[in-house]
A protein has these predicted regions:
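Gly/Ser/Thr-rich phosphate-binding loop
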Residues: 239, 265-270, 279-351, 364-366, ...
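Conserved AMP-binding/adenylate-forming core of the ANL superfamily
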Residues: 28-74, 78-82, 99-104, 155
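Conserved beta-loop-beta connector loops within the AMP-binding
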Residues: 358-386, 422-423, 485-489, 524
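Structural core segment of the AMP-binding/adenylate-forming
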Residues: 15-17, 58-59, 86-159, 170, ...
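Conserved pre-ATP/AMP-binding loop-to-beta segment of ANL
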Residues: 24-26, 159-180, 187, 212-218
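Conserved AMP-binding/adenylation subdomain of ANL enzymes
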Residues: 199-218, 226-266, 281-285
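Conserved AMP-binding A3 loop
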Residues: 39-43, 176-203
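AMP-binding/adenylate-forming catalytic core of the ANL superfamily
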Residues: 98, 104, 115-117, 389, ...
Length: 539
């Protein structure tokens, strides 16, 4: 017997129609390069996205063609998030922070036909234009520059196109967007998102025990729209009818706080480096920003520290940890306390909240051991985290040599080493490649980093394993101090000794002005390992 429900395709046009039909007067705000604010509504985005679809079709867009973007967090990028897939194309957001050689490889590997680039980023495009042959280059006048010769003007194309648009018969499993991983381990890899995955992911992010995005929210996405499907925020905000505030090319802490105050932001999303800067500004300028309403900050991309969480709570902000990957669209876990946990001690509650949390609804997770057995949920047994679900990638685009990243029964092997406790909360111990093997025992670099960043003088800390003649590897910590503070190796060693066994504490502390990072804000440990490859340990 079959169910008697409508067979209604889960496609992006449904989200766009909802945004216009119910929330058409809700604002979308963009900070422009001159720091002025441009305002329009979901209704305006609806019309312009449909114009974009017509314009792309007139330029010759075919079903499944890839349209690349080289744009900041701006309204035109939001328009592309909808305009490209409703035309039957595949939106491909290029990570503008990658090396030009890598951008060229990605665009060629994806087979991008068209490029939409804003005039502010034309210098970035110039660095790889000779290596990628786009059929059309469409320039957005974000900074007000004249469209270069040989390119199409974005506003001119939209002005010539009609708002009247008939959606093609899109299938929910058709490709809607794609994004490449940041390439920390070898070449960047393409992840292709279906309409169905995006719609289900968006509905999930509106859930109470998830991002909890609603029509009452004003959302500030500080996570780049060109990274990891923009954390799904354009589609989630359309589903919920939330106001969206886009920071444009700016990520300075004071500018972020100005936007939060002026636009009454209730939800911000970003990586730890952004939030560290915002917290530092709040601490340095007490009382400058009058933000008296509840604000939720979601943090992903790297582990949060207790010091960061406690710091924001001093200022009345709440912080929630997330976990996901480009391969998971990207939301897969979030960390919220269960009702029975509210009676726990403060220390125990912080410990639980700093975990990556429980898998979100209809995403499954397991810990697998090297011998192929599944680990118990005891909060101790460490193995590789594997996940599966309706918005988890089943393979990489045109890279059959990467098939080993999936288990024989179809689970994604994340490369993260983790354990799961009795309540189902996942705690990442480290990336498998970043664990330190010392004297036959494993040491977590992440735990050491988070502990070090709890020291009042430490701004950032990255820990790596360095070859040792006796112990195989020993931990070395690279530390950036807060401005105007001092700390010495002996002091930091003593600070860590309160939480770690003596053999787990780094044998060396190197003080630096900055730590190299990836394009998405993670520590670039490959660069650190190369830097300290010839490190000589003291006898």
């Amino acid at each position: 017997m079959r169910g008697l429900m409508m067979d209604f395709p889960l496609t992006i046009p449904a989200l766009l129609e909802r945004a216009d039909g119910i929330f058409g007067n809700v604002e979308i705000v963009t900070r422009k390069p001159d720091r002025s604010l441009a305002r329009y509504t979901w209704g305006d985005l609806y019309k312009r996205s449909r114009r974009m679809a017509n314009a792309l079709l007139r330029l010759g867009l075919q079903r499944g063609d890839r349209v690349a973007t080289l744009l900041w967090n701006q309204s035109e990028h939001m328009e592309a998030y909808f305009g490209v897939p409703i035309a039957g194309g595949v939106l491909h957001t290029l990570n503008l922070r990658l090396h030009p050689d890598e951008i060229a490889f990605i665009a060629n590997h994806a087979g991008d036909r068209f490029l939409i680039v804003d005039d502010v980023l034309l210098p970035v495009y110039e660095k790889f234009r000779d290596r990628v042959k786009f059929e059309r280059v469409i320039v957005v006048p974000f900074g007000g520059a004249v469209t270069p010769e040989g390119c199409d003007g974005y506003e001119e194309l939209l002005a010539e196109a009609s708002e009247d648009y008939t959606y093609p018969q899109l299938e929910e499993n058709e490709a809607a967007a794609m994004c490449y991983t940041s390439g920390t381990t070898g070449r960047s890899k393409g992840v292709v998102y279906s309409h169905r995955a995006i719609v289900l992911h968006s509905l999930n992010c509106c859930g109470v025990d998830s991002f909890s995005v609603s029509m009452r929210d004003t959302v500030l996405p500080l996570a780049s729209l060109f990274h990891a499907n923009g954390w799904g925020i354009p589609f989630t905000a359309a589903t919920a009818g939330a106001k969206v505030v886009l920071p444009g090319p700016f990520a300075d802490a004071e500018g972020i706080l100005d936007l939060m105050e002026q636009e009454r932001v209730t939800l911000g999303l970003g990586v730890p480096t952004v939030w560290f800067g915002v917290l530092d500004a709040l601490d340095k300028h007490p009382g400058r920003w009058k933000i008296s309403w509840p604000v939720r900050l979601l943090i992903g991309g790297a582990a949060a520290s207790e010091a960061l969480m406690r710091g924001f709570e001093r200022h009345g902000f709440s912080l929630m940890c997330l976990w996901g990957m480009t391969e998971t669209t990207p939301h897969a876990c979030c960390s919220l306390l269960r009702p029975q946990m509210h009676d726990w001690t403060e220390e125990k509650k912080y410990e639980q909240r700093l975990k990556q949390g429980t898998p979100t609804a209809i995403v499954e997770a397991r810990i697998m051991m090297v011998d192929g057995t599944r680990a118990s949920h005891d909060g101790k047994t460490v193995g590789e985290l594997e996940v599966r679900g309706p918005w988890i990638a089943s393979s990489y685009y045109n890279m059959p040599e990467e098939a080993h990243r999936w288990s024989p029964d179809g689970w994604l092997r994340t490369g993260d080493m983790a354990h799961i406790d009795e309540y189902g909360y996942i705690k990442l111990v480290d990336r498998s490649k970043d664990l330190i093997k010392s004297g036959g025992e494993w040491i977590s670099s992440v735990d050491l980093e988070n502990a070090l960043m709890g020291h009042p003088s430490v701004k950032e800390a990255a820990v790596i394993g360095v070859a040792h003649p006796k112990w195989q590897e020993r931990p070395l910590a690279v530390v950036v101090l807060n401005e105007g503070t001092e700390a010495h190796a002996a002091e930091l060693r003593e600070f860590l000794a309160a939480k770690f066994a003596k053999w787990q504490v780094p044998d060396a502390f190197v003080f630096a002005k900055e730590i190299p990072r990836t394009s998405v804000g993670k520590f670039r440990k490959t660069a650190l390992r190369e830097q300290f490859l010839d490190w000589k340990w003291e006898s």
